[in-house]
């Protein structure tokens, strides 16, 4: 099982951390602000 070999384990952990960091950055910069604007606009429209 290559997942338990230390070299592959470190490789899997490092790439997993890298992918997680990139996805977190992309979602916080591009995806979440759009949902925030949508939520704010819907709350303003519903309060009219």
UniProtKB/Swiss-Prot annotation:
F-type ATPases have 2 components, CF(1) - the catalytic core - and CF(0) - the membrane proton channel. This is ATP synthase protein 8. Its main location: mitochondrion. One of its GO terms (molecular function) is proton transmembrane transporter activity. The chain crosses the membrane at residues 4-24. InterPro entries: ATP_synth_su8_fun. GO terms for biological process: proton motive force-driven ATP synthesis; proton motive force-driven mitochondrial ATP synthesis. Keywords: ATP synthesis, CF(0), Hydrogen ion transport, Ion transport, Membrane, Mitochondrion, Transmembrane, Transmembrane helix, Transport. It is a single-pass membrane protein. It is found in: Mitochondrion membrane. Belongs to the ATPase protein 8 family. Coiled coil: none annotated. Mitochondrial membrane ATP synthase (F(1)F(0) ATP synthase or Complex V) produces ATP from ADP in the presence of a proton gradient across the membrane which is generated by electron transport complexes of the respiratory chain. F-type ATPases consist of two structural domains, F(1) - containing the extramembraneous catalytic core and F(0) - containing the membrane proton channel, linked together by a central stalk and a peripheral stalk. During catalysis, ATP synthesis in the catalytic domain of F(1) is coupled via a rotary mechanism of the central stalk subunits to proton translocation.
């Amino acid at each position: 099982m290559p997942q338990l070999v230390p070299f592959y384990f470190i490789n899997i952990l490092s790439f997993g951390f890298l992918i997680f960091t990139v996805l977190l950055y992309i979602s916080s910069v591009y995806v979440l602000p759009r949902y925030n604007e949508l939520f704010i606009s819907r709350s303003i429209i519903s309060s009219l």
